[in-house]
């Protein structure tokens, strides 16, 4: 981090806050007193933006480590954001993925994030996460993967639950996972009831149980809200975006 990149980041931050719709976070009274892990739908870039701008407590957000590396941004950004675009314009988005790389590196190396790795370096992700929790900082995770489970929410990558095991080993405390549903169309984020980690249950079973309960809770929150368009995890034309439930 340099002073110049930090100044650029603050300018971008200010512009995003100026033009991005103000989002109301509802249900904050359900948050536990201790630091917790928020698990939410990604909703494209809406999830990280809302987490950074409007989450009511001190927090760090898990982000793909590739977004902090100049050489790795283009391939990751194209695949994650634009690979579903029509073939005739994909070349334009491939070019755009290179253009945004320097800005991405600037933003994600200055924002309140923890880089997430998918190799042996993941232990660094876990250690930073546990340290943050010990210091009273909430963690926000968007664990969806490209495996459709229902119209609202894709299936979860489950290994993030292992952080709770390491946290318990270090502190003797049971961290709570808290579901949150982001509804950009309503300009709202809704927090649900916490799900507590059980250190006495085998970790494989805990991964499944916690992810299932969180997934169901987020889906239930979405379905309980007024009819609106859901921003899905998968890249697709906006005309294909689903509703949160069938119209009456």
Whereabouts are the PLM-identified features?
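Flexible, charged surface loops at secondary-structure boundaries
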Residues: 29-34, 55, 132-134
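A generic local structural motif
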Residues: 22-26, 47-48, 101, 126-127
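Low-complexity, charge- and small-residue-enriched intrinsically disordered regions
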Residues: 16-26, 106, 110, 243-248
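Catalytic core of membrane glycerolipid acyltransferases/transacylases, capturing the structured
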Residues: 34-118
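Helix-to-loop junction immediately C-terminal to a conserved catalytic motif
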Residues: 5-6, 12-44
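Non-catalytic C-terminal accessory region of glycerolipid acyltransferases
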Residues: 118-248
């Amino acid at each position: 981090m340099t002073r110049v990149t930090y100044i650029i980041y603050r300018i971008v931050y200010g512009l995003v806050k100026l033009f991005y719709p103000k989002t109301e976070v509802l249900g904050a009274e359900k948050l536990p007193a201790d630091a917790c892990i928020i698990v939410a739908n990604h909703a494209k870039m809406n999830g990280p933006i809302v987490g950074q701008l409007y989450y009511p407590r001190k927090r760090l957000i898990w982000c793909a480590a590739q977004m902090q590396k100049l050489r790795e941004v283009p391939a990751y950004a194209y695949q994650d954001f634009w690979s579903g675009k029509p073939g005739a314009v994909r070349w334009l988005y491939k070019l755009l993925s290179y253009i945004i790389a320097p800005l991405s590196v600037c933003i994600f190396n200055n924002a309140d994030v923890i880089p997430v790795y998918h190799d042996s370096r993941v232990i660094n992700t876990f250690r930073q996460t546990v340290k943050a929790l010990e210091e009273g900082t909430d963690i926000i995770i968007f664990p969806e993967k490209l495996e459709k489970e229902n119209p609202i929410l894709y299936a979860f990558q489950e290994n993030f639950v292992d952080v709770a095991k390491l946290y318990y080993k270090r502190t003797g405390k049971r961290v709570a996972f808290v579901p949150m549903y982001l509804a950009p169309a309503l300009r709202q984020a809704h927090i649900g009831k916490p799900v507590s980690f059980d250190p006495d249950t085998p970790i494989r079973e805990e991964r499944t149980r916690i992810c299932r309960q969180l997934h169901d809770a987020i889906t239930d929150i979405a379905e309980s809200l007024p009819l609106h368009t859901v921003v899905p995890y998968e890249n697709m034309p906006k005309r294909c975006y689903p509703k949160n439930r069938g119209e009456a």
